[in-house]
Regions:
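Alpha-helical scaffold/interaction cores of sigma-54-like transcription cofactors
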Residues: 1-739
Length: 739
């Protein structure tokens, strides 16, 4: 039997078209002994980060073994580890390493792209509405970044019904990429089927000239075996396959086979069929609706060998592609945006002349009092983690400017000269910020907060969460709460023992939030600022309703089934299998004599949790040092406020920071808008200019309102439960409220 890997695979991130979860695909491939798979969703890279993360998790065991064996070999070679026969021991370690490496599963990052029939800037009617399919795989890190560019530009420049690229873009970003001719929607197969043989050959020559041995012709065989399926595709595939094999011989191009995977197992075909009904807005019994062949499951190596036993090289060539693909990481250390520091304060070039690498080594590896606290190995590891000496000059410049701003602000707040307590607190916090590599983050946050207050007239909240524990944040104007007065812990906010990016949630009045984001976009550049994508999944009740609708289950019965689903299940996650186990009526529905009810439950279980659509994170925004598409793929979404297109990362918020991008949270708070409006009303009707930040927080009349529970509209004190406790506890000081 020939070895084989799948190179044309759609996950659930091929929205309402793929029905396969990343984890199930990887698990099945590994169980079948495959050495890797590709993920090639339609026009996007939404699932790539989840894919690489899951594979890394699966590979953690063998990677740990390899790391330990390398360490042992180094120890033997240096003499730190003694053994009787060094050569034999090292040979044994290398053999074990080879065995561990053979267990590694390789993730291949890819995308099934749409190539415009003309050029991606043409957007005129039916000829430009779609495009030819093309499988594009990243061979290495360079290829990954080129794929990001292609996919991002397809959204931002080429979108017309679908995200489209074109030949010009492929020429520009072809390095490090492998391409395959795709399904019968691909340019070459489509032209063969349409008897445009000269045009098909022209396309083959063009791709061969550009990609050389990294261009492959792709064979597929989807012979439908059930009545309600697409029986027209297979004859077309066979027509295309015959000519593709002929062209492969003529132009010395290798062929591969694929199965255009859209679901995991054969028994998922009917669930996938219902998903396509949802996607196309058709009922299951509609005779005109779109049908798949129902052969598009992740077939095993044995099943693929049976399909292509007459073309064994099409199977083995998939391993050639796998071997071409390198292991690389798509994660990155934090990529801090560049804050423009006044030149009269200092420049990187000036700092390079002023400070030696030894100066930087001492400053970044000693404590805030100049004491040596790290051994040489740990110190060098820290320098490396911060990006090396080249990066340290920038960090030091930002840290020094941050210190200047912090101490200037401290003198205004605490008076001059500063007390020893304040100085010690600021020196300690600034040291942590500097040696963790984050001074630029605080410069940027204070910049847009001060711009909101002084330039844009936007109300800014006093601070929330752990950032309120930072005296530096207080002195910069990021927060309005004195952490020294209220004995708030800085270590809850930043802790060198827990390396993670700072997280400052900033509240703006909800009318002004958009203005602040526009200011940030203009300052840092439209290509460097993006919102963060979210994925909407089919929840339990939604899955039932969706399947019921396409199957024409009466609405009353659909509603009845949904009402049987509990809001929560004791000690268990709420999902349909757990709900069925918990609710006898749902068990009865699952075994119902009515096939419509029974099938609704059966396929709702399969579709539950499937990604249904995308959205935009309510407050998360990326500000990047570079064009964001240098690091992650972007798509577009409509700005609800302006109707304009805005950039959105294709990786969601829980993983985006792994790639090095810096997330800032811009929250819109209605409470701030209410306060702003109240101040304006006082000015209008009383002629008084109020500064909300200077109103005393010790006003007895205000505490009387709290004690009476009259706090509707007061942020975090307006719920019925809070009002009840306020009446019971009778707070009389600010410390009572924050206890």
């Amino acid at each position: 039997m020939q070895d084989f890997v799948h190179l044309h695979v759609h996950t659930q991130y091929s929205l309402l078209d793929g029905q396969a979860s990343v984890s199930r695909l990887v698990d099945k491939a590994m169980k079948d002994g495959m050495k890797g798979i590709a993920v090639t969703d339609h026009g996007n890279m939404f699932g790539i980060k989840e894919f690489t993360n899951y594979v890394n998790k699966k590979n953690s065991g063998p990677k740990g073994e390899i790391k330990d064996l390398k360490k042992r070999i180094a120890g033997i070679e240096s003499g730190e580890i003694e053994c009787e026969d060094k050569e034999a021991e090292i040979a044994d370690c290398r053999a074990k390493m080879a065995e561990a490496e053979s267990k590694l599963f390789k993730p291949i990052v890819g995308c099934e792209m749409y190539v415009a029939r003309r050029t991606m800037d043409k957007k005129e009617g039916k000829p430009d509405q779609s495009g030819y399919h093309l499988i594009v795989l990243a061979k290495n890190e360079k290829g990954y970044h080129n794929l990001i560019k292609l996919v991002s530009h397809a959204w931002t420049r080429g979108y017309y019904m679908r995200p489209r690229t074109d030949r010009s873009e492929l020429e520009k970003y072809h390095e490090g990429l492998i391409v395959c001719s795709a399904c019968i929607g691909g340019e070459v197969p489509k032209k063969i089927i349409n008897d445009q043989l000269e045009e098909a050959e022209e396309a083959v020559r063009w791709y061969k000239n550009l990609f050389g041995d990294d261009y492959y012709l792709e064979l597929q065989r989807h012979k439908a075996t059930v009545p309600r399926a697409n029986h027209e595709a297979y004859p077309l595939q066979q027509k295309a396959n015959a000519k593709l094999l002929e062209l492969a011989r003529k132009y010395d191009i290798k062929v591969i086979c694929s199965n255009d995977v859209h679901f995991v197992d054969e028994e998922n075909a009917e669930a996938h069929d219902r998903l396509i009904c949802l996607s196309t807005g058709k009922d299951l019994d509609d005779p005109t609706r779109m049908l798949y062949t129902k052969q598009e499951w992740m077939k095993t190596k044995a099943e693929m060998n049976a399909l292509f036993e007459d073309v064994p090289e099409a199977l083995s060539n998939t391993l050639e592609i796998l071997d071409k693909v390198e292991y690389y990481s798509i994660d990155h250390a934090p990529i801090m945006p560049t804050f423009a520091i006044p030149e009269d304060f200092g420049t990187e070039e000036g700092y390079r002349q002023k400070y030696t690498e030894k100066d930087l080594f001492d400053e970044f590896t000693q404590d805030e009092n100049g004491k040596v606290v790290l051994d040489e190995d740990a110190a060098n590891a820290k320098i490396k983690r911060l990006g090396g000496y080249d990066k340290l000059y920038r960090i030091k410049l930002e840290a020094d400017y941050l210190a200047k701003l912090a101490f200037d602000g401290a003198k205004k707040l605490y008076g001059d000269p500063l007390s020893d307590e304040v100085k010690e607190r600021l020196v300690f916090e600034l040291y942590i910020m500097k040696t963790m590599g984050f001074p630029g983050y605080f410069l940027i946050v204070q910049d847009f907060i001060n711009a909101a207050r002084t330039q844009l007239g936007v109300s800014v909240g006093p601070g929330r969460g752990s950032a309120a524990g930072s005296a530096v944040a207080y002195c910069l104007g990021i927060t309005k709460i004195d952490p020294i007065q209220y004995d708030l812990l800085f270590e809850r906010f930043l802790n060198p023992d827990r390396i993670s990016l700072p997280d400052i949630d900033v509240d703006f009045d909800d009318d002004g939030r958009g203005e602040v984001l526009r200011w940030v976009t203009e300052k840092y550049g439209q290509e460097k600022v993006a919102h963060i994508i979210t994925y909407g999944t089919m929840a339990t009740k939604m899955a039932i309703k969706d399947v019921a609708r396409v199957q024409k289950l009466p609405l009353s019965e659909s509603d009845r089934l949904c009402k049987l689903v509990p809001d929560k299940i004791p000690d268990k996650k709420l999902n349909l299998p757990n709900a069925i186990a918990y609710v006898p009526e749902l068990q009865a529905a699952e075994a119902s004599p009515d096939p419509l009810v029974r099938d609704t439950m059966k396929y709702a279980k399969m579709l539950e949790g499937n990604v249904r659509g995308t959205g935009v994170h309510a407050c998360g925004t990326i500000i990047c040092r570079d064009d964001i598409t240098d690091w992650v793929p972007v798509s577009t979404a409509d700005d609800k406020e302006t109707g304009e297109k805005m950039l959105v990362t294709q990786y969601e918020g829980s993983v985006i920071e792994d790639t090095g991008l810096i997330k800032m949270d811009f929250l819109g708070l209605k409470t701030l808008s209410i306060i702003k409006e109240a101040v304006a009303n006082v000015r209008l009707h009383r002629g008084l200019e109020l500064d909300i930040d200077k109103i005393s927080i010790s006003d007895p009349a205000t505490y009387k309102l709290y004690c009476d529970g009259r706090t509707i509209g007061t942020f975090q004190f307006e719920s019925a439960g809070m009002q009840k406790y306020l009446r019971e506890l009778q707070p009389s000081t600010f410390e009572d409220l924050i206890a």
